[in-house]
Amino acid sequence: MQPALSIKNLRKTYDDQFEALKGIDLDVAKGDFFALLGPNGAGKSTTIGIICSLVRKTEGLVTIFGHDIDKDFSAAKQFVGVVPQEFNFNQFEKPLDILVAQAGYYGIKKDIARQRAEKYLRQLGLWERRNEISRTLSGGMKRRLMIARALIHEPQLLVLDEPTAGVDIELRRSMWEFLKQINDQGTTIILTTHYLEEAESLCRNIAIIDHGTIVKNTSMKALLKQLDRETFILDVREELSESPKLEGYPMTLVDGHCLEVDVMKGQSINEIFIELNGLNIHVISMRSKANRLEELFFDMVEKNLVDVDGGQDNE
């Protein structure tokens, strides 16, 4: 079956002779939810930039649903929607106007554009703010607006760069549910993230890139079998004088409003939230610490769990 994305011998060398990509090969199947992970400077942003025609490759072949991004640029572009990490829209425009204008770049008639804009703004909880100046929106709302903008031409491949960075727990999970929904409807999704839990919750397959080389390409299920634990930092509303005692969850009080907890393989962070709520301790934000990607990656290298030859697991 023709993949949604096919990358063959992709190389990128910048003018200063820095070799960002060293001949990577990667296929993403139609309908997949795929994570591309790597330490800062590993090459994932360059890879995403080439896929989205924002960076010019030095060598190699990239096809999107069979369309060569060089020889058939216009067709390939129609298949891709991009959600960058940074807010890159005119924040003095209104959300509805932003979406309708974006649709126009793809030749979509204004009446159809408005129908789609309403659909996505409603689905993403932004319809009531459709006529407000975008700079008045919260960071989470702006991120949802960028997702709506990426979807307005109804691409078959959605690429998200750190889609929930800086987003609170409740909003993050609602965004996860929306992304799962559009993936279930057939949209292929590729995301980069530093949150192991995010990749675990959303993605079926994963590639790890480092120093311009794919060092691991496997299923999420196979990768998780190799991990021991993840450490989370929890910010809580209440001021604490000591660490809560939760059976099976080693927890340290970092300061009055901050806890550090180890979650072992097979355990669920949601269980911690439930138990803390039972103690009238309310988590307002969460971030991964010990197994944020850089540390996870180097831990895997130390344990010889990464196939440095770039081989693919079939599990």
Protein language model annotation of sequence segments:
Residues G60-K71, A75-A76:
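Conserved ABC transporter NBD signature motif
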Residues V100, G104, D111-R129:
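Conserved ABC ATPase "signature" region
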Residues I133-L137:
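Conserved ABC ATPase signature
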Residues I147:
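Hydrophobic anchor residue at the start of the ABC signature
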Residues I152-Q156:
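A short, proline-enriched helix->beta-strand linker immediately N-terminal to the Walker B motif
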Residues L158-D161:
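Catalytic Walker B motif of ABC-type/P-loop ATPase nucleotide-binding domains
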Residues W176-M264:
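ABC transporter nucleotide-binding domain
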